[in-house]
């Protein structure tokens, strides 16, 4: 009986998150004195790829948050998608294009600036914006 309940719970989670608008928040602890360079590299190599995915309707929105005062998670990227499956498809496409178009030494440099990283996937319960 426990196995059936567990399977039911997993199915409920899948059904809920696979059909609801989501926001993925990718938080980074970036070396403080490297933040400006990190943003410059991302603006050149990462952002145009994911902005294009929004323009093509594959993602709903992308953005970057940054602060120099507060907690240690000083740079975050966020991605809104109509559902988890759409996000995963767009993410895979975007990351593949990034890897193909960005020299390995630049990717290594970006990675070396990140001391720690974590991702969270949120189901949007309320969102209002003027478009």
Please give the residue ranges for each predicted region.
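An amphipathic, aromatic/His-enriched active-site/gating alpha helix that lines ligand/cofactor pockets
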Residues: 44-60, 78-125
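Acidic helix-start/capping segments at beta-turn-to-alpha-helix junctions
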Residues: 61-78
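Residues that flank catalytic or metal-binding motifs in active/ligand-binding sites
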Residues: 22-24, 73-75, 115
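A beta-strand edge to alpha-helix "cap/lid" segment located at domain peripheries
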Residues: 69, 88, 125-131
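Sec/Tat signal peptide C-region and signal peptidase I cleavage site
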Residues: 14-20
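Sec-dependent signal peptide recognition
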Residues: 2-10
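Short N-terminal segments immediately surrounding and downstream of signal-peptide cleavage
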Residues: 21-40
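Short, flexible beta-strand-to-coil junctions
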Residues: 29-31, 69, 81-82
């Amino acid at each position: 009986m426990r196995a059936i309940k567990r399977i039911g719970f997993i199915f409920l989670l899948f059904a809920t998150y696979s059909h609801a608008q989501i926001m993925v928040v990718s938080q980074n602890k970036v070396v403080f004195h490297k933040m400006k360079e990190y943003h410059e590299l991302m603006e050149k190599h990462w952002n145009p790829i994911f902005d294009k995915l929004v323009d093509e309707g594959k993602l709903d929105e992308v953005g970057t948050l940054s602060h120099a005062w507060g907690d240690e998670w000083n740079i975050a990227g966020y991605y809104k998608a109509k559902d988890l499956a759409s996000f995963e498809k767009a993410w895979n496409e975007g990351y593949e294009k990034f890897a193909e178009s960005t020299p390995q030494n630049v990717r290594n440099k970006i990675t070396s600036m990140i001391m720690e990283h974590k991702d969270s996937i949120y189901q949007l319960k309320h969102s209002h914006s003027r478009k």
